Amino acid sequence: MSSGGLLLLLGLLTLWEVLTPVSSKDRPRFCELPADPGPCNGLFQAFYYNPVQRKCLKFRYGGCKGNPNTFKTIEECKRTCAA
């Protein structure tokens, strides 16, 4: 296979990995945690996975501590937790 063909294959595999949803058995356990703004007083938009609604939702993050179910972008939340 030519180097161009290998590069195309690598690109397609990477795209497939990014776009493939996480199955519930592969979902990290921290995705079940509730949204936690943390103790700080910042007003940052963040996203968390809501297991009841089975989707990523917005919430206000204080900027420190909180829990691992806190994402800067909805894409990162979906990639990590959404089924």
Swiss-Prot record:
BPTI/Kunitz inhibitor domain residues are 31-81
GO terms of molecular function: serine-type endopeptidase inhibitor activity; toxin activity
User: Would the keyword Secreted be found if you checked this record's keyword annotation?
Assistant: yes
Tissue specificity field: Expressed by the venom gland.
Keyword annotations of the record = Disulfide bond, Protease inhibitor, Secreted, Serine protease inhibitor, Signal, Toxin
- Alphabetical list of CDD domains matching this protein: Kunitz_textilinin-like
- The positions making up the signal sequence are 1-24
InterPro entries attached to this UniProt entry: Kunitz_BPTI, Kunitz_BPTI_sf, Prtase_inh_Kunz-CS, TFPI/VKTCI-like
- What are its GO cellular component terms? extracellular space
Protein family per UniProt = Belongs to the venom Kunitz-type family.
Q: What does this protein do?
A: Specifically inhibits MMP2 activity (EC(50)=100 nM and Ki=60 nM).
- Comment field (misc): Negative results: does not inhibit serine proteases (trypsin, chymotrypsin, elastase, kallikrein, plasmin and pepsin), cysteine protease (cathepsin G), and MMP (1, 3, 7, 8, 9, 10, 12, 13, and 14), as well as voltage-gated potassium channels (Shaker, Shal, Shaw, and rKv1.1/KCNA1). Does not inhibit vasopressin V2 receptor (V2R/AVPR2).
- Protein's name according to its UniProt entry: Kunitz serine protease inhibitor Pr-mulgin 1
Name the source organism. Pseudechis rossignolii (Papuan pigmy mulga snake)
